[in-house]
């Protein structure tokens, strides 16, 4: 009886679909929960609880039906997903543990990442491309890669899309000798991109000379034979730190780049194998996320 009176406070629990972890006010024995480092109760350790008075439709009686098998299922599913529950963020909500395995959720996350990669591409622009090319996903990705700001980023002259759009908005960029003031300007095969003569061009040339890693410097480094291994490892680590912020003189196969003259030309239409993204997207396989625009009109 003393234990019942002293232990009055209880900890809030997550309300799961499988297992129905609910709140209990009075208990004696406690064991740590593997999920949240908290307390959970087994069937044998519970006291018969008094039912609450019904004040309305929302208030319901507490149930003591609680099995060990359901706990094991919950724990195994949580460890697969890697879900973590924190003390402050626990709320009474039904959560589908199989939600991440569904194809719709995977496609929706890819859809949002894809739009953020192109600097929050508006749905209006995205839907216009979808209607124009009749839902052909390969052609949509090719057209997005033909934009001027994306070509600058893929070439290596620019570190981010923000910098590329700043150059275009300030009218430092030329396409076939004419100013391109829009970042969504589409480039055709055979077009030549260049920079205006001025301060912006000089800054880019200085940065590229310092930043580019030439092939000759790599060969010299490999051919050297140092006497001591410790000194050799120290030099390699030091060189790796310097080369982190540098830009490599490489680009995709569908672009021809000259770093000395700051010229870019599109030779072929971009292929899906040559396109790379920072997140895990295989454009050859996971292109079906664009078809969400058909079924669900209110995508954010």
Swiss-Prot record:
Subcellular location: Mitochondrion
Biological process terms in GO annotation: aggregation involved in sorocarp development; regulation of apoptotic process; regulation of cell cycle; ribosomal small subunit biogenesis
A Pfam family reported for this protein in Swiss-Prot or TrEMBL: S4
InterPro entries with a match to the protein in the record: Ribosomal_uS4 (IPR022801), S4_RNA-bd (IPR002942), S4_RNA-bd_sf (IPR036986)
Cellular component GO terms held in the UniProt record: cytoplasm; mitochondrial small ribosomal subunit; small ribosomal subunit
Alphabetized UniProt keyword annotations: Mitochondrion, Ribonucleoprotein, Ribosomal protein, RNA-binding, rRNA-binding
Superkingdom as given in the UniProt entry: Eukaryota
SMART domains: S4
Principal subcellular localization: mitochondrion
UniProt domain S4 RNA-binding: residue ranges: 146-209
Molecular function (Gene Ontology), one example: structural constituent of ribosome
Protein's UniProt keywords contain Ribosomal protein: yes
Family statement: Belongs to the universal ribosomal protein uS4 family.
Protein name (database record): Small ribosomal subunit protein uS4m
């Amino acid at each position: 009886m003393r234990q019942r009176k002293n232990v009055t406070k209880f900890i809030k629990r997550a309300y799961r679909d499988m297992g129905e972890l609910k709140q209990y006010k009075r208990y004696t024995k406690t064991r740590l929960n593997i999920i949240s480092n908290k307390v959970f109760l087994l069937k044998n350790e519970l006291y018969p609880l008094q039912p609450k008075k019904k004040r309305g439709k929302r208030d319901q009686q507490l149930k003591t039906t609680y099995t060990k098998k359901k706990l094991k299922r919950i724990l195994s599913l949580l460890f697969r997903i890697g879900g973590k529950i924190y003390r402050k963020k626990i709320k009474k909500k039904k959560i589908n543990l199989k939600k991440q395995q569904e194809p719709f959720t995977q496609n929706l996350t890819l859809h949002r990442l894809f739009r953020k990669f192109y600097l929050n591409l508006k749905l209006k622009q995205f839907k216009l491309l979808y209607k124009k090319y009749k839902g052909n996903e390969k052609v949509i990705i090719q057209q997005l890669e033909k934009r001027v700001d994306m070509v600058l980023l893929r070439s290596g002259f620019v570190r981010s899309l923000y910098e590329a759009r700043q150059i275009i908005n300030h009218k430092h960029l030329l396409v076939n000798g004419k100013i391109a003031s829009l970042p969504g300007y589409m480039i055709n095969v055979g077009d030549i991109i260049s920079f205006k003569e001025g301060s912006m061009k000089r800054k880019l040339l200085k940065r590229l000379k310092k930043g580019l890693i030439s092939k000759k410097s790599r060969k010299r480094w490999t051919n050297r034979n140092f006497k001591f291994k410790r000194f050799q490892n120290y030099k390699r680590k030091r060189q790796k730190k310097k080369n982190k912020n540098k830009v490599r003189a490489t680009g995709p196969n569908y672009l021809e780049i000259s770093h000395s003259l700051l010229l870019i030309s599109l030779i072929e239409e971009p292929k899906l194998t040559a396109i790379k993204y920072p997140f895990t997207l295989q454009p050859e396989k996971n292109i079906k996320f664009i078809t969400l625009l058909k079924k669900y009109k209110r995508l954010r």
